[in-house]
Amino acid sequence: MNALVARVGAVRAVAPSAGVASTVGHSPKRMLFLDLVLSVFRLNGLLVAEGDAMTEDLGLTSARWKVIGVVALSTAGLTVPGIARVLGQSRQAVQRITDVMAQDGLITYEPNPKHKRSVLVLLTDEGKSAYHALREVQDPWAIRNTEDIPIEELETSLRLVRRLIQRLDK
């Protein structure tokens, strides 16, 4: 609890100088949540940078990595809005990247029997090869970054993140 009090004090000391003065109470739970939010922002930036570095030799980017991964894990393809929902991005942003990926031969658009105007995104043979190449670098990276973290801690973290996503995704 002393570490929490020290962190809360540090955040209080920094916030006013950053123009973030607030009259709302600084409960420990609120401060922990805000610490979590800032940490997730930082983690996102680090994951994008790591993803770009990992995929560079494959001629890809972390944005393409995300799309390839989501489509590869779907059983029957996904629509652009479906990919956007999974990634928490706008449909327009996903449409831009999938259009470029289609031009580059990584994905193809196929008719959707469930919706005439919303086509399915599927991996081409080249896209499947890229996915397998990504797995060759992604799997050791994942192992390296989690080898000293107990599986229970990862499971608890995943449950918390999914719960917050569900709560915020309204």
Where are these regions (language model features)?
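N-terminal leader segment of winged-helix/HTH proteins
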Residues: 1-58
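Charged, amphipathic alpha-helical coiled-coil/dimerization segments
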Residues: 9, 23, 79, 99-156
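Short Lys/Arg-rich basic patches
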Residues: 32, 95, 111
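Hydrophobic alpha-helical core bundles mediating ligand binding, dimerization, or RNAP-core interactions
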Residues: 33-55, 131-149, 154-168
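Base-recognition residues in the alpha-helical recognition helix of bacterial helix-turn-helix
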Residues: 38, 66-69, 95-97
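N-terminal helix-turn-helix DNA-binding core of bacterial DNA-binding proteins
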Residues: 45-90
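Residues within the DNA-recognition helix of helix-turn-helix
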Residues: 93, 97-100, 160
